[in-house]
Amino acid sequence: MASHHEITDHKHGEMDIRHQQATFAGFIKGATWVSILSIAVLVFLALANS
């Protein structure tokens, strides 16, 4: 039975990763904002409680 997938040799560094890089950059930006907001809320709560 014939295979429907062509088997090729892997060549390191030839894959287009622009979408993965953009997704990772967005994730890092979002994680940074969530961290900053969380710290700001904690500081506000600490100051409001004192």
From Swiss-Prot:
This is Cytochrome c oxidase subunit 4. It holds the Pfam family COX4_pro_2. One of its GO terms (molecular function) is cytochrome-c oxidase activity. It is an enzyme of class 7 (translocase). It comes from Paracoccus denitrificans. The chain crosses the membrane at residues 18-49. Residues 50 are periplasmic. It comes from the Bacteria. Its main location: membrane. It is found in: Cell inner membrane. It catalyses: 4 Fe(II)-[cytochrome c] + O2 + 8 H(+)(in) = 4 Fe(III)-[cytochrome c] + 2 H2O + 4 H(+)(out). It is a single-pass membrane protein. SUPFAM superfamilies: Bacterial aa3 type cytochrome c oxidase subunit IV.
